[in-house]
């Protein structure tokens, strides 16, 4: 009998959901940085064996939205509650267990298997982790609780084994050679945005979106033109930097990562444009792929 199912990863910002997703899939599907709200979309990563298919979904961190883009991000997270066969609720050793009580209540009332993953235990001690397990058991009495360190791969194999045990009997949902539901252009824009998150401070990374205007692939190389959108002229100047040096650094680092990702020579051109309404315009957000169902 073949097993298959949707395993959706939810939780608050910056608890390590994307790192865990990448470890479970065994590939770099989601960008992961030390900054909150790195993930903006719902991203699927697919694990296949002869008799099993696990469709993991990484989701944006749960937050109270301040503008339309964040409303869409929350909708991605809430949609993950609706179509999961197994839910992974990820927290860490410093998070307040009662943060975002409304979302947590939705998790508590779910009838599917829920695994509460306490991440980053390498940054704590056995006593503190034990106390957290007790607190979480009181909040989510029906959930299985598994402490892990995704960054160090501690406990990840045990988590994967438990997921395999809980998977329902089902034919595969995707072709067995498919790794994700996202096209190549999506990963290009995400990798460029990752470098912006790493190299710029304050509001700049959160005011930026990337659109790939051209993606031409041949047997040995890829030519990419990408536009970085910001909200204000002042942000455009910061992104470009003195004599274009800041943008050149981001583009160089993005190109290196893209060459590893695609295993090909990459030629990357980046441009910066101002679109002051992109975070609040439904039309603009839709063009950037913010289409929660």
Which residues make up each language-model segment?
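Canonical P-loop GTPase G-domain recognition
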Residues: 113, 122-180
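Active-site phosphate-binding and catalytic loops of NTP-dependent enzymes
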Residues: 30-32, 99, 171-175, 198-209
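Conserved glycine(s) of the Walker
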Residues: 16, 155, 246
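Conserved C-terminal guanine-recognition region of P-loop GTPase G domains, centered on the G4
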Residues: 75-143, 216-218
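P-loop NTP-binding site
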Residues: 184-293
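Conserved G1/Walker A P-loop phosphate-binding module
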Residues: 1-75, 79-81
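Catalytic P-loop NTPase motifs of RecA-like helicase/translocase cores
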Residues: 39, 62-64, 96-97, 124-125, ...
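Active-site glycine-centered loops adjacent to acidic/histidine catalytic or metal-binding residues
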Residues: 58, 119, 149
């Amino acid at each position: 009998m073949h097993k298959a199912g949707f395993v959706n990863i939810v939780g608050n910002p910056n608890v390590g959901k994307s790192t865990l997703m990448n470890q479970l899939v065994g590939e770099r599907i989601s960008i992961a940085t030390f900054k909150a709200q790195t993930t903006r979309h719902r991203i699927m990563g697919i694990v296949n064996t002869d008799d099993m298919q696990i469709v993991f979904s990484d989701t944006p961190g749960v937050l109270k939205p301040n503008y339309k883009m964040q409303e869409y991000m929350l909708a991605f997270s809430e949609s993950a509650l609706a179509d999961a066969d197994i839910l992974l609720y990820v927290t860490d050793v410093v998070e307040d267990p009662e943060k975002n009580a409304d979302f947590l209540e939705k998790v508590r009332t779910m009838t599917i298997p829920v695994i509460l993953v306490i991440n980053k235990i390498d940054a704590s001690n056995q006593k503190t982790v034990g106390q957290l397990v007790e607190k979480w058991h009181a909040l989510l009495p029906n959930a299985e609780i598994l402490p892990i360190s995704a960054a160090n791969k501690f406990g990840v194999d045990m988590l994967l084994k438990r997921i395999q045990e809980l998977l329902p009997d089902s034919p595969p949902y995707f072709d067995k050679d498919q790794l994700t539901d996202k096209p190549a252009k999506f990963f290009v824009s995400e990798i460029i945005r990752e470098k912006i998150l790493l190299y710029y401070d304050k509001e700049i990374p959160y005011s930026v979106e990337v659109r790939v205007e051209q993606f031409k692939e041949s047997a040995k190389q890829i030519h990419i033109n990408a536009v970085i959108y910001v909200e204000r002229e002042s942000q455009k100047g910061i992104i470009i930097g003195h004599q274009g040096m800041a943008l050149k650094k981001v583009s160089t680092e993005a190109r290196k990562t893209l060459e590893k990702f695609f295993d090909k020579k990459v030629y990357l051109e980046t441009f910066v444009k101002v679109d002051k309404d992109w975070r609040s315009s439904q039309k603009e957000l839709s063009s950037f792929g913010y289409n929660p169902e």
